Amino acid sequence: MVFRLSPGDVAGFKFLFSLAIMYAIMSALVYSIVHMKFIKPLAIDAPLDRFSEARAVEHVRVLVQDGRQEGRPGLREAAKYIKAQLELIEDRAGSNIRIEIEESVVNGSFNMVFLGHSISLGYRNHTNIIMRMSSKDSKDADSSVLINGHFDSPLGSPGAGDCGTCVASMLELARLIVDSGWIPPRPIIFLFNGAEELFMLGAHGFMKTYKWRDSIGASINVEASGTGGLDLVCQSGPGAWPSLIYAQAAIYPMAHSAAQDVFPVIPGDTDYRMFSQDYGSIPSLDIIFLLGGYYYHTSYDTLDKLLPGSMQARGDNLLSILKAFTNSSKLRTAQEREALRASSDDYRDEQAVFFDYLSWFMIFYSRRVAVVLHSIPIAIFLLMPFLLHFLELGLRSWFAMFCDFVKGLLLHAAGIILAIVFPVIFSIMRLFFSSCAMNWFAHPYLAFMMFIPCSLVGLLIPRTVWSCFPLSQDVSVLKKSKEVLSDEAWFWGAFGFYACLTLAYLVAGLGGGFLTFSVSAFMLLAWISFNAYIKSYHHQSLWSTVIYVVPLIPCILYSVYFGGFLVQFLIEKMGMMGAAPPPYGFYIADGVVAAIIGVVTGWCVGPLIPICGRWLARSSIIQFLLHISVLALALSSQFFPYSNTAPKRVVFQHTVVTTDANRILDSSYDFSIVDSNSLLFVFKYAPEVAKDLHVGTDFSFKTANMSHRETWMALFPVSHLFSRSLKFPASSDDIIKEYRYFPHLSNYKPHTISSKGSRKVYLELSLG
């Protein structure tokens, strides 16, 4: 049997392949931008008045030589190295600049909510290194700018990215300020804090004890959730001023107000919280490396994993932003901010709307402007039926046209929903025939191959089913053809869908409304171009569709940029987002990634569907896309989920339960995982581990010893991300030989009960 294509099918496939080429070119451009391919790092012999990534990398090289975890000698050595480098910078400074260096040991206690759990923390003897740089004429009370980075590293990690890059960038920046001869008009405080990984203790100690903390008028927190890539402003505030300064000053702007809508969902936090939210209300920026998350908090976070160009972009940006902050008339001390808040009715903590375009330039507008701008699309959608029929036929059939527009809106919404649902269904179906989840984890392109084609199928189904739009208007009365009226209904329905989403963002007070607003704005331009072509040539053709697509290219390119980065970031983070209990936990990671790719596909392709759907919504194309989806699903099952550059995270703990000062009750190895592939997967593909733990081929969770959540109290509340942790017996002989006495708690005084019924217990901790 010969499979024949009609001329319309041939034209549709030509158009589909043309779109595929367009999106491929856009994806290649976006990949280059996100991975800093267009930024040339300066060499170690670069001019001294320029920030040099190579010089900064040399600092990272020293910092990663030994572990910088709290309690290890490497942390103390890192503090000595940082202080020595700052003293060298002080020696090079001219007579017109004042540099003060201080090593501070902080103690304190506080309560915080982390991952939805309230925890209380007490700490002592944590080290902060502080340098205050100011002009000779400055006063102690002058408002200043704080830039913060932490030099401790997480357990088991060299910490090249997190946060050796932060410390190195700050050291090179401090050197640059001195060697360039720039005298800051306001003081700049460099804080190298030594305890961020332990619930931000160093930043808390600084905010509670530093003598000039009330003089700080703005802060910049530099962080790393990976080894480079986009250095994104993930949080800013309170107020719009910090993001405005960034928009005006950044050389390579990388910021989206939408990030503040997403950041609270991520299981983590930064020192930004201490400065701008919990203990300071300081106008702040939280700037974070986001790519390379595979290595985040692992032993793979090494010097060779750093993405070239990332620190160069960060350094150039930071210098420009520091200059803008120190020159701003809005840089105020804590007392001045409080006085302004009390006396001015115009003082607002409203968040602005801002976004960068491919890190080339940045668009910023206030919340008040957003209220007006983001209301325009819905106003156009509601008024357009009345305006069109008032100009053409009076008031007689405007309601029928509005009904058609609403039908178009509902059908477009159905397409977007199906574009999300279909990939989720396909991801679940694949797992029915596979023994492992997350095959895309080490190979992100597999996720796009698997889920984009089936998402397109969902997007096209409404247009395929309703190839003839169910018009409410009477074609016999109107001077327009049914084809033209259908195109109007499809277009204005889709436009109305994005207008409604824009309004929903606005009402909810979220910062991501610019995403759908830009789609609405460019769709209008495309519609005007399309109609101008039709009026000139009096017929629709493939060229008229191309005329519709061309004005949308800037919008589509941004959608690919934002959406592609979002998917890449999410895929990297799925390896540490936690393990849900079976049976549903096995499907969650694949379902989430499939749903996000469906959303991104709907966002990137959805604006094209009203006009391009005429060529794409054909049964032959639907079948072709389904075949690609099935083939990609089958192909992906042949790939192993992990690799040396995308390792699986396994949490291992040697647990020793003691009583009194010298007796061991129990000794065990506790294992857990933080993604969808269980420990059975680990034992299957890491036979050495199974052998050491005496795990046989007949092992099952039903007969295994489960590790109780209380066992992981040292990692609370991160331990709530674990599921089905296992416990294996361990010998205690080596421990008894090594230690004569163990840490233990004892009462050193009888407990007391207050008049209100609360009990006070007096405990003494002996370290053994």
What are the residue ranges of the model-derived segments?
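Cytosolic-side membrane-insertion boundary helix
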Residues: 346-381, 397-405
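Alpha-helical transmembrane segments of integral membrane proteins
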Residues: 3, 20-29, 377-725, 733, ...
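Alpha-helical transmembrane signal-anchor/signal-peptide segments
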Residues: 34-57, 641-662
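Soluble extramembrane regions of membrane proteins in the secretory/endomembrane system
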Residues: 41-365, 768
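Hydrophobic alpha-helical membrane-insertion signals
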Residues: 15-24, 28-45, 82
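N-terminal Lys/Arg-rich, disordered targeting/topogenic segments
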Residues: 1-9
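C-terminal domain-closing interface element
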Residues: 210, 214-233, 370-396
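Extracytosolic and intramembrane catalytic regions of membrane-associated proteins
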Residues: 80-132, 245-248, 658-768
